[in-house]
Curated annotation (Swiss-Prot):
It comes from Mus musculus. InterPro entries: MRF-like, MYRF_C2, MYRF_ICA, NDT80_DNA-bd_dom, NDT80_DNA-bd_dom_sf, p53-like_TF_DNA-bd_sf, S74_ICA. GO terms for molecular function: DNA binding; DNA-binding transcription factor activity. The gene is Myrfl. The chain crosses the membrane at residues 624-644. The keyword Magnesium does not apply. Residues 538-575 form a coiled coil. This is Myelin regulatory factor-like protein. Residues 46-132, 656-688 are annotated as: Disordered. Residues 663-688 have a biased composition (Low complexity). Pfam families: MRF_C2, MYRF_ICA, NDT80_PhoG, Peptidase_S74. Residues 446-554 form the Peptidase S74 domain.
């Protein structure tokens, strides 16, 4: 029929729709229809732009037929570009396109809102009542959509379309089948939208979504650009929006034939495709089409046609849909109101159970490139198996009697199969996604009659493995915790990958697990904590063995300690034994002389014979005594000589203190002792004081004022009670140490035997420093008047007169072995604060201690004119402040520090 004018065209259009009289509606904007009729269009384009939901359906929203990037409007194709084989009938009415101004304003016209509701703006997955909506909202958590900035749909007053989510697409999902091509900025965008999408409903609270996988019935064709360069494979993903429900009994998705279903296809093209590579060469691309059809599982060559509901509730064969693919963008195409043209075979149940001869369909959605009515497959996806029934699928879900039965024991229920709680894919007899409370005990079979190959394990290896395991604190990801029903996200445990390297049999792969954001974790790992528990039992047994060995060794050490004490007592009685031996020899001489006289007076006839007979034993005895005394004297001289040589050798030997700060100048001759009987001694000389560096804070603090020095003259040595008490204590220790040292040579060979050398502990200090100024205390501070060598070290440390009284002194003592440092005694001299009493002496013997390699002591040096401290560095459990000084240099080493302000 010829169209003479726009008014006649409008009249015929509305008569075909059965909407005569709507032109009289004052709310109708005819400019939109006039613009539409004024342009060229074809019926195929109208058919492609049909609404997704017929006007009579109030429960299903309409979605746009095609979304580029983020639900953009589909541009009108030029006329005459769709093959005749795919054109719809001319009687099929087409929808009117949206006016640009109307889309921007977000307004609707009353005459069209009942027939063709506008597409809503993007909405997130919301929890809604009704089983159909529940499954739909779940699928979009599993297959999110990538948002393209700058594109959005206008808001509307209609019900929001929950199947469109431009702000939650995960671009990384393409990488499962295709090479990733997203840029850096796109990746950041995806993460932001993923976090927004996690606020939705957990996956396990929804029905499972229909899964898709690549399908290649024929080889896929490659795309080339204008320079004949091969482009990467097309990113292609199919998402099921609605229309399918999962039947646990049938273990398949079920679709009702009279109810329509809807799918959404996401397409990503990299570059600008211009040619398609075929078997006969390169062909220019004219159009891109989407085609959907079904196939039978048992016979994949048999195609099942797909139908689409029209606006007048009639069904027509679904023809390929022409689409426009933009360069380097995600194109979203929604195919709605689809039906299978026939049902599957053998749908009826047998005695309430699924039919063993049940037949299935599979849905295929492919992307084609067209050239002169020839179609070339670019990508295709195929769904899981589907059951298509003519009646409501809910009528078939009466499966409680088939799964659960009463047991033989009273009040018991039996399930012959796998049970899943909060999960629809149980792979064990019972799988619980969430917390579980067990008030009783969990029993395991352990009867020896059902075991074989019983072998004793190596507890040493179990201890080694347990020592390698790392215990960590962690938080489950929110989407995973919500999907698996984990209420307490923060937990303490192990990492399965780390345990797998140490104890592989304690880790199991349970297959693929889908998280709350749709991310699939391949070969998910779980830990068998029972195996780790048994490893702990073996490790504890090994620790018990080690503890017993240590106890035995401690007992042996105690025995050696008793032997050492006995040797000490023997050495103390050695001198008395020597004197007794000399007296016995003298007594024997006198006795022999008197006996000779008596025998001579009684028997004069045998004087010569008996005299020779008695004189020989006396001479031999006297000779032996003289030789013995000479040998003992020689031994004593040898011991004294060795002792003197050892003392000289020890003086020449430097202690284990750092000598990095020592200069080439001779050792300072700091006089730290003087006779206590002299009331006053001469002050220190200037030369001596300059050779020892002072403890000064002038590098970090201003040195302008003098603290804690008398105004009437220079400081006199040893006028402080701290110095006098320290010197008295030092002299006592020196005398005891010297006496014990002379005795120790008798037992030194027993103490330092090859058996003890391996366990000998070095109790000397590796380094000493003032922490605040990093000042090392070394041999330069050693006292010249007192012993400063193995066993006892005496240090005289001058403090600069400009040192404030409120600075902190931290003495750091470093050892090469883990030792214990005791502060056995301290003595404080004159206090520097003028507001308090001028002279205060305080001392203490409350022993304090530190352990380890590094020992830091806070000392009140700056607040006093002088102070003295006695530290004892001892081996653990072998010495303390009350240990006999005899063991100095063996079990402990004494250190005396005397700090004084140098005021001259």
């Amino acid at each position: 029929m010829d169209v003479l004018g726009e008014n006649e065209a409008l009249q015929q259009f509305f008569e075909a729709q059965g909407a005569s009289g709507t032109l009289e509606n004052p709310a109708l904007d005819t400019s939109l229809l006039e613009e539409f009729l004024g342009n060229d269009f074809d019926l195929g384009a109208l058919q492609r732009q049909l609404p997704d939901t017929p006007p009579y359906s109030a429960s299903d929203p309409r979605s746009p037929p095609q979304v580029k990037g983020a639900c953009c409007r589909t541009p009108r194709p030029p006329a005459g570009r769709i093959p005749a084989a795919f054109l719809h009938s001319t009687t099929a009415p087409g929808p009117l396109p949206e006016h640009p101004s109307q889309s921007m304003a977000g307004q609707t016209h009353s005459s069209f809102q009942n027939g063709y509701p506008e597409s809503s703006h993007p909405a997130t997955c919301r929890h809604q009542t009704g089983p159909s909506r529940l499954g739909t909202s779940c699928s979009f958590h599993q297959q999110p959509l990538c948002h393209v900035p700058g594109s959005s749909l206008p808001p509307t007053k209609k019900r929001k379309h929950s199947q469109i989510q431009e702000d939650s697409w995960d671009c990384s999902s393409w990488a499962h089948y295709f090479r990733p091509m997203t840029t850096r900025s796109q990746s950041i965008e995806v993460q932001d939208h993923d976090r927004e999408g996690r606020n939705g409903m957990p996956v396990d609270q929804c029905s499972p979504a229909l899964k898709w996988q690549p399908y290649q019935s024929v080889p896929w064709h490659s795309l080339l650009n204008s320079r004949y360069e091969k482009l990467p494979e097309v990113g292609y993903q199919v998402v099921t929006d609605k229309g399918f429900t999962f039947s646990p009994v049938d273990e398949a998705f079920v679709c009702q034939k009279k109810n329509h279903f809807q799918i959404t296809v996401h397409i990503q093209v990299w570059g600008s495709p211009k040619f398609v590579k075929t078997q006969v060469g390169l062909k220019p691309i004219e159009k891109f089409y989407l085609k959907a059809f079904g196939i039978k599982v048992e016979a994949t060559n048999q195609v099942i046609a797909i139908e689409q509901s029209q606006a007048d509730r009639s069904k027509k064969t679904f023809d390929p849909v022409k689409i426009d693919l933009l360069t380097d963008q995600v194109t979203k195409v929604t195919l709605g109101r689809l039906h299978f043209s026939e049902t599957t075979a053998n749908n009826m149940r047998k005695k309430g159970k699924p039919n063993p001869d049940q037949r299935y369909f599979m849905l295929v959605v492919g992307l084609y490139a067209a050239n002169q009515d020839q179609f070339y497959l670019l990508a295709a996806h195929i769904s899981e198996r589907i059951i298509v029934r003519a009646s409501n699928p809910g009528q078939f879900e009466n499966d409680s009697d088939a799964l659960w039965q009463r047991g033989q024991v009273p009040e018991s229920i039996v399930c012959h199969g796998r049970v899943g709680i909060n999960t629809d894919t149980p792979d064990e007899a019972l799988v619980v996604c969430g917390n579980m409370k067990v008030m009783g005990t969990v029993m395991h079979p352990s009867d020896s009659r059902v075991k074989e190959n019983i072998q004793e394990v190596d507890t040493n290896e179990q201890l080694r493995r347990i020592a390698q395991m790392r215990i960590v604190q962690y938080d489950y990801k929110p989407e995973f915790a919500s999907a698996m029903g984990i209420n307490t996200a923060h937990q303490t445990g192990m990492i399965a990958q780390e345990v797998q390297e140490i104890l592989p049999r304690a880790v199991r792969e349970v297959g693929d697990v889908t998280g709350g954001n749709g991310e699939t974790l391949e070969n998910f790992l779980m830990v068998d904590k029972d195996q780790i528990f048994m490893e702990n039992v073996g490790a504890v047994k090994q620790l018990c063995k080690l503890t017993n060995n240590l106890e035995e060794r401690i007992e042996e050490l105690e025995i050696w300690n008793k032997k050492l004490a006995r040797l000490k007592r023997l050495s103390s009685s050695w001198k008395s034994s020597i004197s007794e031996a000399s007296s016995i020899s003298k007594l024997s001489r006198a006795v022999s002389a008197s006996s000779a006289r008596r025998t001579g007076s009684k028997k004069p006839t045998k004087v010569s014979f008996s005299g020779r007979k008695q004189s020989c034993p006396n001479w031999v005895f006297q000779t032996l005594v003289v030789v013995l005394i000479a040998v003992m004297a020689f031994c004593a001289l040898t011991i004294v000589a060795l002792y003197i040589l050892s003392l000289k050798d020890q003086d020449r030997r430097s202690p284990n203190l750092p000598l990095s700060n020592m200069t080439s100048s001779p050792e300072p001759a700091l006089s730290s002792t003087a006779p206590t009987s002299a009331p006053h001694t001469t002050p220190e000389t200037t030369q001596t004081s300059l050779q020892v560096p002072e403890i000064t804070f002038c590098e970090i603090l201003p040195c302008q004022e003098t603290y804690c020095c008398p105004v009437w003259g220079p400081r006199i040595l040893f006028s402080s009670p701290a110095q006098r008490q320290l010197e008295a204590e030092r002299e006592i220790h020196q005398r005891q140490w010297a006496e014990d040292k002379s005795k120790s040579f008798l037992t030194s060979s027993a103490l330092i035997s090859p058996d003890w050398e391996s366990d000998w502990i070095d109790t000397t200090i590796a380094s000493i420093q003032i922490v605040e100024i990093q000042q090392m205390i070394d041999r330069r501070y050693c006292s010249r008047m007192l012993h400063c060598g193995p066993g006892h070290y005496n240090y005289n440390i001058p403090v600069n007169k400009n040192t404030p009284t409120n600075v902190k002194f931290s003495l750091e003592i470093n050892t090469t072995e883990p030792l214990i440092v005791f502060q056995c005694k301290y003595t404080l001299g004159n206090i520097c604060f003028r507001s308090q009493r001028e002279r205060t002496q305080s001392d203490g013997e409350d022993a304090q201690m530190t352990q380890g390699y590094q020992h830091i002591w806070r000392l009140p040096v700056a607040r006093f004119s002088d102070s003295a401290y006695h530290f004892r560095v001892a081996a653990p459990d072998l010495a303390d402040c009350s240990t006999d000084p005899f063991f100095a240099g063996i079990f402990f080493t004494d250190y005396f520090f005397y700090f004084y302000r140098r005021c001259n």
